[in-house]
Regions:
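Nucleotide/phosphate-binding catalytic cleft detector across ATP-hydrolyzing
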Residues: 311
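Acidic catalytic cores of enzymes that act on phosphate-bearing nucleotides/polynucleotides
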Residues: 59-136, 146-148, 154
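Extended, alpha-helix-rich binding/interface surfaces that flank or overlap catalytic cores
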Residues: 306
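Conserved ATP-binding subdomain of kinase catalytic cores across diverse folds
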Residues: 1-63, 117-303
Length: 311
């Protein structure tokens, strides 16, 4: 819930929507999540909010997207290069070398060839950049790789997301088998919960850290809040939280669902607002931490730039 709230609040902050919309989105998140949790029954699909028309429309558009749409929305052109700016940053020589070596490995070649039958195992790294992806990239390895699969006119362009896998925050169930490698854990979990996504993911290591590589498809593009009206954004927040609540409920027994519901409704609500204060304060604090860290990074970069200019 906190992670979804942070994503929605960050997206709303970067849109033209008024700040009060964020508060209403968090409110509706609580309602949607709680409804899915309380309405779930073992063995069935539970009670979930009907999908708003705006979500159905966006999903329809996403499924109809082609590579050029993905390129336009993520790298702003259809040439084999990634323009640097606020979303994409230049890499060090070490990063460039390590990522190039990663895509020269037989395992990754075979994986990409399986995703693109008929194009062979020849891979060309056209460009790579550090990807500034909100809270998930702060202090972590996160890269966008513009990759070509195949030769010449038969080459197929694709965008590969490389993301550092971190230690799980949630405790494991007693006696449950869990991979020791965080990247392997993430991939196995994705293949179990969302096979269509998980089958496009591969675990590996980069710069001594576990990473997950995933080919992005056009329909993977995130929901852009600035495409929505204030009312639509609030409806979308409620529906997305309902989906999360449904997923969480399916992993709990009745006692655990009851405890989670009581936690969601416990004291701490203020000024007549329904969202628990712990949810709101967590989202606000995380946004503040992220913004402060980003500005501190910019300050350090400016200092280094001044030193290079003076040298």
């Amino acid at each position: 819930m906190i992670r979804l709230g942070l994503s929605l609040a960050t997206a709303a902050r970067r849109s033209d929507l008024p700040g009060v919309t964020t508060a209403h989105m968090i409110e509706e998140m609580t309602e949607g999540y709680g409804l899915a949790l309380s309405g779930f029954q073992d063995g069935d699909t539970g009670s979930m909010e009907p999908t708003p028309e705006v979500i159905r429309t966006l999903i329809g558009h996403a499924l109809g997207r082609k590579w050029k749409h993905l390129a336009r929305e993520r790298i702003r052109n259809v040439k084999p290069s990634i323009p640097l700016g606020d979303k994409f940053w230049a890499l060090s020589d070490e990063e460039q070398h390590e990522i190039g070596a990663l895509f020269e490995g037989d395992r990754l070649r075979a994986f990409m060839a399986a995703l693109h039958p008929g194009h062979g195992q020849h891979l060309t790294v056209h460009d790579v950049a550090y990807w500034v992806k909100g809270c998930s990239s702060l202090g972590r390895l996160r890269y966008a790789v513009l990759l070509g699969v195949g030769h010449g006119r038969d080459e197929k362009l694709c965008l590969v997301d490389i993301k550092e896998a971190v230690q799980a925050a949630a405790p494991r169930a007693s006696g449950a088998a869990m991979p020791g490698d965080d990247a392997v854990r993430v991939v196995e979990g994705a293949r179990s919960l969302a096979p269509f996504l998980g089958e496009r993911m591969l675990a590996g290591r980069l710069l001594g850290r576990p990473v997950v590589m995933r080919e992005l498809l056009p329909q993977d593009l995130k929901l852009e809040i600035d495409q929505l009206s204030r009312k639509e954004a609030v409806e979308a927040a409620r529906n997305l939280a309902s989906v999360v609540g449904q997923a969480h409920a399916s992993q709990m027994d009745a006692a655990a669902r009851g405890a989670r519901g009581r936690e969601l409704g416990r004291s701490g609500r203020v000024d007549g607002l329904d969202a628990p204060s712990w949810l709101w304060s967590s989202v606000v604090q995380l946004m503040a931490v992220h913004e402060a860290a980003y500005l501190e990074h910019c300050r350090a970069y400016a200092r280094d730039e001044d030193r290079r200019s003076a040298a």
